[in-house]
């Protein structure tokens, strides 16, 4: 009889994924539990922290989100940044340049009023001339109206993720990289731990924050998630501080399906495209750096399709060459909402995924909300709109689901 191998490790709570969401959950758990010998927290990832989707994020911290729950999660991230700066004694480089939401048509003005109407933060309404004074790269003639939210900004996503990591470590959280998680082990309807390429780790609670790999990992426990990996992409112009000053606000331009922000004297801009590229989560490689996302569906095709309207709104783009193209995978859901909280099918399994291109912005709120759910406490944000099972039983690998998730990205109008 072959003896069962002994577990290689154990923890009270295991977080799978050392991207910004996993680190934010670990940070929040660590600060509630403390380092005084209470419940232990272990973060596991095959990659070094923050080297996958987090490292490629545009990291717009826009507060106008279209629904109160998501907006509350973003507000909590601003609070988290302040808390981290105080704890670590350093400036995390939050650029509070504000966000300018631009409407190029009367119909879009109505939609914009709805979007920012629920915001609890100040909003300044501007005409085309006012918008162009604030953002000189905009064409006043092309702007019908614009809403400026002066307290918004953007941040270096890796720097913020590393702050969560360091703060979590100070609170006693352990982080183990170089371990490939193969499955969540379930016994009699509840989590028993995780199987890795090096052996079994005992844990009665697992938080799935595995990003693009989260659907496959959840399926190993018999849970279907309503999400798919979808390509996100942006471009960076050559440095032209004469055209794109460093204090330029974040620009959200839904008529062009575009956003932009300053990047060291250049302009970083993204286009959502009429048809986003979604991938089969069952066929992902272990490292997204190995994916050919540049040409699979043509980053150039998306650029050409959206260029005319974007250049009409932002004519200086015609004078600036493009220096860089960046693509990576976000996880989008069919209804454009995060996947957060307990999985109803398996006791002890929680989700922190489905970032929908807003994972950096909502990271602090997600960390605190998921930590509260794990610990059975009342959080400040109701996670019901983000419940993993909200769309019913589904096949996470179906082409129809992938198409719906891709459409959710293409139709996105917030930051």
Positions of the model-derived regions?
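Short beta-strand to alpha-helix junction loop
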Residues: 72-75, 101-111, 147-166, 295-304, ...
